[in-house]
A protein has these predicted regions:
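Internal, charge-rich low-complexity segments
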Residues: 2-8, 45-94, 250-295
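Coupling/switch/interface segments within P-loop NTPase motor domains and analogous charged loops
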Residues: 23-179, 308-309
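SF2 helicase catalytic motif II
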Residues: 57-87, 185-217
């Protein structure tokens, strides 16, 4: 109701269900890119579960180490189990070997030829993954591939693979976090609905925008020129929770030419002043409540209302 019919028809929008979907959108040519991208608040923080991306991580990790013929064969044999694609019968050892010996940028054509991908599908591997491969520490994944994969099957292979898959997923999640930090994408605006969910430092949402300790790195730090937080319940938050939500604005891209006119340090100083003022207000409120509770009827009986006030 705030715009004329048809006035917004030029805007392209889409929904990114996962980090992979989002990064694929960044591969689009500028004139084809969407103006608005909708995601859930858990899109970037949830476990990284894309099978083809994980397989590509195996391929890129292999480039960082020398492997024996037996170790390579173990990868060809067990990779579908690691990425939980054993039901795709076309993903055979032969196909995995073919992928492991090909540039990940050429995987789309191979997967189409092997009937594992529709011809009109996007490339399964966003360009950003191989682009930053030399800035990523692959040692955790290399260790799993070199030391943890079974050399042969056994009666308890399912139990063994479950444990190995856990190690593998942890390594992939670490690589994903590095990938997200190193990627050079930026956005002019982030609109975060239900922003009060960022009130606790150790939630996945909060850690996207702010550090809970000196050792942490917020994954979306420096990605947005402007940030707009929406919440219908700001005054239901405790004042410390409100301060923590406000501190999430620290993730703004302060180095851009459209950065705020004041510095990050100045903003942090103002937030600290607000925190001190809210602390003082809370103490004063508690003191007033205590003193008010100590008033007794006999203390007022000999005074007129005007005199009492």
């Amino acid at each position: 109701h705030c715009s004329l019919d048809g006035s917004l028809d030029w805007i392209r929008d889409t929904y990114a269900h996962s980090p992979t979907d989002f990064f694929k959108l960044l591969d689009d040519q500028e004139h084809q890119r969407n103006h608005l991208v909708f995601t859930t608040t858990g899109c970037f923080s949830k476990g990284f579960n894309d099978a083809w991306i994980k397989l590509a991580m195996i391929r890129l990790a292999r480039q960082k180490t020398k492997m024996s013929a037996q170790q390579k064969q173990s990868i060809f044999r067990w990779a579908p189990h690691l990425i939980r694609q054993t039901t795709k019968h076309k993903l055979t050892e032969r196909v995995v070997k073919k992928l492991m010996n090909s540039d990940v940028k050429n995987w789309k054509q191979i997967l189409i030829q092997e009937y594992l991908l529709d011809p009109d599908a996007d490339s399964p591997i966003p360009d950003m993954l191989p682009e930053f491969k030399d800035k990523i520490d692959w040692s955790g994944l290399v260790k799993v591939l070199r030391e943890s994969l079974p050399k042969r099957t056994s009666a308890n292979i399912k139990h063994r693979m479950k444990k190995i898959r856990g190690e593998f997923n942890d390594a992939c999640q670490g690589i994903y976090a590095q990938w997200l930090r190193h990627s050079k994408w930026h956005s002019p605006l982030l609109i975060l609905d239900e922003a009060h969910h960022a009130k606790n430092d150790h939630t996945n949402l909060a850690q996207l925008f702010r550090q809970s300790s000196a050792d942490d790195v917020s994954l979306l730090r420096g990605k947005f020129q402007r940030m707009l937080f929406l919440t219908a319940t700001p005054f239901q938050l405790g004042h410390q929770e409100l301060i923590r939500v406000i501190r999430s604005f620290d993730a703004i891209r302060w180095s851009s030419r459209r950065a705020p006119t004041i510095s990050r340090d100045e903003v942090q100083s103002e937030i600290k002043q607000l925190e001190v003022a809210l602390d003082a207000n809370r103490r004063a409120g508690r003191q007033l409540d205590r003193l008010w509770g100590e008033i007794r009827p006999e203390m007022l009986s000999e005074l007129s209302i005007d005199a009492w006030w």
